[in-house]
Amino acid sequence: MSTNSFHDYVDLKSRTNTRQFSDDEEFTTPPKLSNFGSALLSHTEKTSASEILSSHNNDKIANRLEEMDRSSSRSHPPPSMGNLTSGHTSTSSHSTLFGRYLRNNHQTSMTTMNTSDIEINVGNSLDKSFERIRNLRQNMKEDITAKYAERRSKRFLISNRTTKLGPAKRAMTLTNIFDEDVPNSPNQPINARETVELPLEDSHQTNFKETKRNTDYDSIDFGDLNPIQYIKKHNLPTSDLPLISQIYFDKQREENRQAALRKHSSRELLYKSRSSSSSLSSNNLLANKDNSITSNNGSQPRRKVSTGSSSSKSSIEIRRALKENIDTSNNSNFNSPIHKIYKGISRNKDSDSEKREVLRNISINANHADNLLQQENKRLKRSLDDAITNENINSKNLEVFYHRPAPKPPVTKKVEIVEPAKSASLSNNRNIITVNDSQYEKIELLGRGGSSRVYKVKGSGNRVYALKRVSFDAFDDSSIDGFKGEIELLEKLKDQKRVIQLLDYEMGDGLLYLIMECGDHDLSQILNQRSGMPLDFNFVRFYTKEMLLCIKVVHDAGIVHSDLKPANFVLVKGILKIIDFGIANAVPEHTVNIYRETQIGTPNYMAPEALVAMNYTQNSENQHEGNKWKVGRPSDMWSCGCIIYQMIYGKPPYGSFQGQNRLLAIMNPDVKIPFPEHTSNNEKIPKSAIELMKACLYRNPDKRWTVDKVLSSTFLQPFMISGSIMEDLIRNAVRYGSEKPHISQDDLNDVVDTVLRKFADYKI
């Protein structure tokens, strides 16, 4: 065999093997299920055949080259060329380069010629010619070996991918299963696909085939084992793995096929049952459909005997039973054939559903098939119910096909309780509150207390307001009077800038809505934010003055607030305003105090006189007055002094007491309020500030300062005197004393008053 013919043969063989292992072949028939075992066995046998063929071809090439070498040596017998090819002819073909490569599935190192015995004569031209021939032959061998190794590696990669992954699986329809037989069934010979006739047979290949023939694995029961686990369990040789794998996958394929047949049979049964039950209206139509069913049964594809084989029989039985049921009208409703057959179908459907549950993981379209099956079950039940209804009607009168209309339901009288419409009510949206036909949208909850809540709302034009919602007992006259009094006071102080403005209000059954200005922050929030910060008397002086201005407006209007606390002073656009006149009341013109029958105010800021009962008179008619509480303008000044005390010391005067002890401490005159000169952070407190707090916190209401006097105190109106003025004052005082060593008390008082009048010009 020449070199060109050898190359052509190797190329042809490579293309043949490549086509065998390729996945891109053209399918003329519907795609089949993959057979991993068949592919593995075919690859093993083809590999062994190709190895033998390659070894024989390589032996022929080696012998051919050896004969050429001998002929050349006979024609030119140089004495030094006797052992030229001894390295290749002394061993068998299996020890050559090709034999080593084929037996080991990887490329070995290139062999070199044994030229230890060759004697080279450099001066002889004939030796040079033979040397070139020998080099040419060696290059040719290396070229052939390299090409063969490259093709061999390509075939190995293709075959390895095919045997591991197998050809691509393709979904099969039920029609393909019934119209054509499944290839590679267990009865088919294993070597049916081997069509290549090998010219040479090796003993290794013959023994391999005989081993496959002699071993009988038809009765294998794998159970839950795979082929590899089965071989390990029974200590079988690994050479039998392809055959066992093929048997394993053949059995799996047969089980899938049987499962598909059973599923198809159950669908066919349901479909035919539905079509039969829907044809109960006409006897002629039933006869025609019997003929069509008979013709359809004759044209059905050949399949194995399974549950589907009884589907056509069951459908014919259903039709015959339905005919008999229509012809015989004396049968009872519940013992009629249609009920019996329906029960039989239900039992078959239950058994089929159990089988489908087992095969759910095998079918590739299980979910879709189950949905279709459920729809068919529903349609079948509806059709059977219609058939039973029609059968009952036909048993009575075959000419009547309509139902008697149902009787009208008895007329019942309904009693509706209509609630009175509220002028201010919640709309369908819980965030919308309507007050006097104006809608307000709730934004957030600002605060709550008792039975009232204050919301931040948004009205027309995106303006922000404060909405106070108060719920009360509609039959409590005192509550209603209190709310009316608050509204009257706000109406009275409507034009005052230091009082929160009442914009709108509405009182319904048990609900009161007040629309007022919305503040940015209250004084309690400001004090909490400044807790822990260094004491700033300018801050204390500013907010004390703002607070007193609000109280002055209320007192000038003859009103006692009675519940002054930091939370009732709100900043509205930078101006501090007073709010919450819920328990305030006007002071009669003939007195400075008012009396209440209930305790009012916040305990931390309540005056002692608001807690101590008055000494009632001896008059029996006025004994009930001993339970009343005395409140007046001085009570508001006590509350104001408590707020100033909290701004300086960080807590109210009686803040160290808890619960009931706090009330007892306020009423007990022996419990003195401390006024330290330094704070807890060792910050010095001016004497003017201590003097102001003491003036507001006298236990005797008559000794407390009024609002006007507190506003004119030295703490709020300090002197701003420079150093030069103080120097001039000292010089003048010394000069005046030296000139008049003896001065009377009256003259001294006149001098002091004059100096103070001049200092008044330097007040802030």
From Swiss-Prot:
Its EC number is 2.7.12.2. InterPro entries: Kinase-like_dom_sf, Mps1, Mps1_cat, Prot_kinase_dom, Protein_kinase_ATP_BS, Ser/Thr_kinase_AS. Coiled coil: none annotated. CDD domains: PKc_Mps1. It catalyses: L-seryl-[protein] + ATP = O-phospho-L-seryl-[protein] + ADP + H(+); L-threonyl-[protein] + ATP = O-phospho-L-threonyl-[protein] + ADP + H(+); L-tyrosyl-[protein] + ATP = O-phospho-L-tyrosyl-[protein] + ADP + H(+). PROSITE patterns: PROTEIN_KINASE_ATP (PS00107), PROTEIN_KINASE_DOM (PS50011), PROTEIN_KINASE_ST (PS00108). ATP binds at L446, G447, R448, G449, G450, S451, S452, R453, V454, K468. Signal peptide: none annotated. The keyword Phosphoprotein applies. The keyword Cell inner membrane does not apply. Autophosphorylated. The active site is at D563 (proton acceptor). GO terms for cellular component: kinetochore; nucleus; peroxisome; spindle pole body. Residues 85-95, 272-292, 306-315 have a biased composition (Low complexity). Residues 201-216 have a biased composition (Basic and acidic residues). One of its GO terms (molecular function) is protein serine kinase activity. Residues 440-720 form the Protein kinase domain. GO terms for biological process: chromosome segregation; meiotic spindle assembly checkpoint signaling; meiotic spindle checkpoint signaling; mitotic spindle assembly checkpoint signaling; protein localization to kinetochore; regulation of attachment of spindle microtubules to kinetochore; sister chromatid biorientation; spindle assembly. Residues 66-95, 197-216, 258-316 are annotated as: Disordered. Keywords: ATP-binding, Kinase, Nucleotide-binding, Phosphoprotein, Serine/threonine-protein kinase, Transferase. Pfam families: Pkinase. Belongs to the protein kinase superfamily. Ser/Thr protein kinase family. Involved in mitotic spindle assembly checkpoint signaling, a process that delays anaphase until chromosomes are bioriented on the spindle, and in the repair of incorrect mitotic kinetochore-spindle microtubule attachments. Phosphorylates SPC105 on MELT motifs; phosphorylation is required for recruitment of the BUB1-BUB3 complex to kinetochores. Phosphorylates CNN1, which contributes to the enrichment of CNN1 on anaphase kinetochores. Implicated in spindle pole body (SPD) duplication. Phosphorylates the SPC29 and SPC110 spindle pole body components. This is Serine/threonine-protein kinase MPS1. It comes from Saccharomyces cerevisiae (strain ATCC 204508 / S288c).
